[in-house]
């Protein structure tokens, strides 16, 4: 449950952050993780997940970012999301959000693999809930919820109970996405949100995210954790591969498939080249 790019042309070369050319737009630091150290201790051992990890997401073009984190199990991808969401603190280090150190009061929505809703409430009640909690007028809250319900493709489902089997798993994830965005967050975290869905629902939900990302009234930085290279390339304009022991950034890519991409881009040579390049680098990891 959620709480409540400039172009390479046809090149797919991984680049360090320091080489990014920003043109006339001054890049905005969205997220900065500095000198992050994460140690898990037991009576008999000490496991170091991160040892002075640095991780940065910038809004390069002034249009938000869709960033994906790839990596094998245990490299710390989901832990990074938990830091940003405020669900976990590192052993040491700084977490900076839009130039300010993150506090316990900060709430950043996060969507997980297992869909979650309040099953005793309707779809529109679920989506409007974060605004109701903030004491927004009910009419205003429901109007905003209706807008997002339409964007995520649930028109006509507003008054259904938000539970399975009245709604499918894919529909319940749409409810979660709409609820996470209704209070106008600047960041949305996605931890393997579609891995439990069939390919049809997965493709449809990918398109929902792209529709939201392209919507000029929804200014959100999306951060996706996934094991699916094709999904990461399709959705992202920035992509990171992580390695483990200790967890750190291994490669970084800018993905230039255009802001108005759709499923047909998956048949293009440019998309295929990106996927092959990322796969080759990913497969070098131990």
List PLM regions with ranges.
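Conserved ABC ATPase "signature" region
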Residues: 139-158, 210-211
């Amino acid at each position: 449950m959620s709480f409540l790019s400039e172009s390479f042309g046809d090149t797919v070369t991984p680049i360090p952050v320091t080489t990014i050319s920003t043109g006339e737009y001054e890049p905005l630091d969205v997220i900065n993780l500095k000198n992050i150290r994460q140690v898990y201790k037991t009576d008999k051992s000490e496991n170091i997940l991160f040892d002075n990890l640095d991780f940065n997401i910038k809004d390069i073009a002034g249009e938000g970012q869709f960033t994906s984190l790839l990596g094998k199990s245990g490299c710390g991808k989901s832990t990074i999301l938990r830091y940003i969401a405020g669900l976990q603190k590192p052993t040491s280090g700084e977490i900076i959000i839009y130039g300010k150190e993150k506090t316990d009061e900060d709430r950043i929505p996060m969507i997980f693999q297992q869909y979650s809703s309040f099953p005793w409430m309707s779809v529109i009640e679920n989506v409007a809930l974060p605004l109701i909690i903030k004491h927004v007028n009910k009419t205003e809250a429901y109007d905003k919820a209706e807008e997002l319900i339409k964007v995520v493709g649930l028109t006509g489902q507003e008054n259904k109970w938000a539970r399975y089997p009245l709604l499918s798993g894919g529909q319940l994830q749409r409810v979660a996405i709409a609820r996470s965005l209704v209070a106008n967050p600047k960041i949305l975290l996605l931890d393997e949100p579609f891995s439990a869905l069939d390919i049809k629902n997965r493709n449809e939900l990918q398109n929902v995210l792209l529709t939201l990302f392209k919507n000029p009234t929804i200014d959100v930085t999306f951060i996706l954790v996934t094991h699916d290279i094709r999904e990461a390339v399709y959705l992202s304009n920035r992509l990171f591969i992580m390695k483990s022991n200790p967890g750190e950034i291994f490669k970084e890519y800018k993905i230039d498939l255009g802001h108005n991409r759709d499923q047909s881009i998956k048949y293009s040579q440019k998309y295929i080249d990106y996927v092959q390049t990322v796969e080759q680098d990913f497969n070098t990891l131990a």
